[in-house]
Structures are given as C-alpha cells and as structure tokens.
C-alpha cells in the first residue's frame, strides 16, 4: 500500500515538473516565433487587404491574426512595430487597478507564475508577449521566476511570490475573473484562457499610454 502511494506521489510530482518545464519551453518558442514573424514581415512584405483602424492617434493593423502598432522606444528615437493578440476595441472592459506605471522605470522585472497551477500554454503566451515588449520597448530585462521551488523547472529560477520587498514582478495567474491590479510590489495579471492574454495586452497598452 505504501509503495503504491509512493509511486502515485512520484507520478504526480513528475507530471508537475513536466508542466513547469513545458511552460519555460513555450515561452522560449513563442518569443522566437514572434521575432521570426516580425523579421519576415519586413523581408517579404505581402500585398494583401488588411484590417486597420485608429485609436487615440495610434494606428492598429491586423496582419495574419495579430494586431500591430508602432511604438517609440522609451528614451530614444527608435520606433518598433509591436505585435499584440488583441486591439484596444477588444479590451475596453478590462480596467487597471492601481499605479502600474511605477514599474516602468525598473531595470529588471520578474515574470512569475505558480508551477503547480494549470493552463501553462496561455501563461507562457502571455509571458512571452510581455517579455518581448519589456525588453524591446522599455529596455527592461524580464526575469523568469516561480512562486515556489517545487518542480525541477523551477530549481534554477528565482522564487518570487510577491511577498518580498524589492522584487518588482508581474504575476500571471489563471483565474476566472479577468483583472489587472497592483498589490504589494507586484502587478497581478489574471484571466481564464484567452482572457489572460487579453489582460496582458491591456497592461501593455496602458504602459504604451494608448489606453487609460
């Protein structure tokens, strides 16, 4: 009986470790994929009808399912084409609670998640989108972290649970309620499946000063 319980515990632990590793791998894959798409867009421009509209003096153009707008990099004259999964017209019902702009001047920001949670694919997609924009537009270094050191994938990662002062972080949470809010030294970005990605894009558009 004890052996059976031990085997079940080992299987459960192995499953959790695989999920956490999957999260890290998906972040890397999606980041590379997005950068490749951006590069191909300029190397092989396509002549096609595109959906486009203006919002708050920013033009949003839908190309192959992604929304692009041009953003000037903070403190420079460089302009980047930023890809998002959702445009402002789809994000008006998500409010920002608290002062998220206080995080824009940080040198590093941790991107943390619960390794024992679920739906890592949406968390990874959100993490990669936020990470690319932090580095490319705000010159902020994103650091992958975990809220607990409970899986093999998190052994070499910093533990950031939003309870320790001096660790600015974005905590990606898979929850039913779609929210973006500040608590302690963290920005909590939460939602269910694609709603989590929406919440991530909403934060970015706030930081770009496109949406209030």
Q: Where are the language model's segments positioned?
A:
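Short, flexible coil/linker segments at or flanking structured domains
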Residues: 11, 31, 41-43, 48, ...
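N-terminal Lys/Arg-rich, disordered targeting/topogenic segments
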Residues: 1-20
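Residue-level signal for well-ordered alpha-helical segments
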Residues: 16, 20, 30-32, 57
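Long, folded non-catalytic interaction modules
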Residues: 62-212
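Glycan-processing catalytic domains of CAZymes
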Residues: 13-18, 54-55, 62
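Hydrophobic membrane-insertion alpha-helices, especially the h-region
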Residues: 24-42
